[in-house]
Design a protein with these regions (language model features):
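N-terminal subdomain of nucleotide-sugar transferases
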Residues: 1-60, 106, 160, 192
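Nucleotide-activated donor-binding/catalytic signature segment of Leloir-type glycosyltransferases, i.e.
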Residues: 251-275
Length: 389
């Protein structure tokens, strides 16, 4: 039997995780699902109740402490000694979570555990393997591998014990193989998947609608997009721009819009349910995501919104960051510009707005490319080979 362990599930910003689980269910593979934390309380998650109700969420507070103590008492003498040695360390809770979850995995007959992100859940899986000898695999994404951390159990320890590491882009896979050459053979590239049939292109609205979606954080480059919109407005280009999402830079971005006098052109639309995002993609002229590499190494790798835009037959304006160039073929399915360059971004936007035939050609080719490399059916079947299912 297969199980999944998440730090938090369901979670609004991780639709790719839900899609993976839903496709496994469609393929008649029904993993047990464990979540270390309570589910996301963001916008409405219109997800299959059969999946959401199947999630085993860990108890909190005293209830968890009591159950974890009971589970820990059944561990081997060596495992109990390890628990004692780790008492008081920053990550000691992971060991108690491993004792609690591992005991339940054993009762369920789970032979393989899969985890997304090399963070809290992966460190818990490390200890589950240590205490219960249950094999695990890991899908890594972006900040969990690009940004250095000082966890007591880090990537080196995880990579030395994991059965397989799934990188969601060739860019990330090469980085990991270079950094962890001793375990390079364990690294596999499998893209996140999407069902393109859930995203249908429609006639774009007028005036041109520039759509951008993501958390309002520095690496997304929304400041660059707003500055590019100011350049478009100053050049008398008619357009609207909607930025969907929320985050710590919301107030800064609103102030930037007001400083440029873009209140009539640019809207911070806040978070929106997935169904509404799909509808807005179908009405947009293009997707813009001028992402950048942060000072700490944080960057996008395989932005889900670009997959969704391509599935919606939208041309994309972005940058050559992480795995974006594997998604957006420059001059074929969209336009790639340099990071932190609002002038080049504005020119790319203007080119697509003023040349609808080119934009439509890019969009059609982008949808074909998405169907080819992001097929949820094909990519989940590749995952199942790693799970030996």
């Amino acid at each position: 039997m297969l199980a999944y362990l998440f730090e938090r599930f369901p979670k609004f910003s991780q639709t790719f995780c839900y899609r993976e689980i839903a496709e496994l269910f469609r393929q008649d593979v029904r993993p047990a699902i464990f979540s270390l934390r309570a589910p996301d309380r963001g916008p409405e998650l219109n997800w299959d109740p059969a999946i959401v109700s199947a999630v085993h969420q860990l108890p909190e507070g005293d209830a968890f402490a009591r159950l974890a103590d009971e589970a820990s008492a059944t561990l081997s003498r060596a495992a109990r000694r390890t628990l004692h040695e780790w008492r008081g360390k920053d990550d000691s809770l992971r060991l108690h979570q491993a004792a609690y979850i591992g005991a339940r995995l054993q009762k369920l007959g789970v032979r393989h555990l899969h985890v997304h992100f090399a963070g809290m859940a992966a460190r818990t899986a490390f200890w589950i393997k240590r205490f219960f000898e249950i094999e695990y695999s890991l899908t890594v994404h972006a900040n969990d591998i690009f940004v250095p951390n000082n966890f007591e159990i880090g990537l080196l320890q995880i990579f030395s014990t994991v059965r397989a590491v799934v990188a969601v882009s060739d860019f990330a896979a090469k980085q990991l193989r270079d950094r962890f050459s001793d375990t390079a053979s364990r690294v596999h590239r499998i893209y996140n998947g999407i069902d393109c049939d859930n995203f249908q292109p429609a006639e774009p609205s007028r005036p041109a609608l520039i759509l951008s979606i993501g958390r309002l954080i520095n690496k997304k480059g929304f400041d660059v997009l707003i500055d590019a919109c100011a350049s478009l407005r100053n050049g008398n280009q008619e357009f609207r721009c909607e930025i969907i999402g929320e985050g710590p830079l919301s107030a800064d971005m609103q102030a930037r819009i007001e400083r440029h006098g873009l209140g009539k052109q640019v809207l911070l639309a806040g978070p929106r349910p997935q169904a509404e995002i799909a509808a807005r993609l179908s009405r947009a002229t293009l997707l813009a995501l001028p992402c950048r590499v942060d000072a700490d190494g944080a960057m996008d790798n395989l932005p889900t919104v670009i997959m969704e835009a391509m599935a919606s037959a939208l041309p994309v304006v972005s940058t050559d960051v992480g795995g974006v160039a594997e998604m957006v073929r420059n001059g074929e399915t969209g336009l790639l510009v340099n990071q932190n360059d609002p002038i080049a971004t504005a020119e790319a936007l203007r080119r697509l707005i003023t040349n609808p035939e080119l934009a439509q050609s890019f969009g059609r080719k982008g949808r074909e490319h998405a169907k080819e490399i992001f097929s949820i059916d094909k990519n989940v079947r590749a995952l199942r080979q790693i799970f030996a299912l």
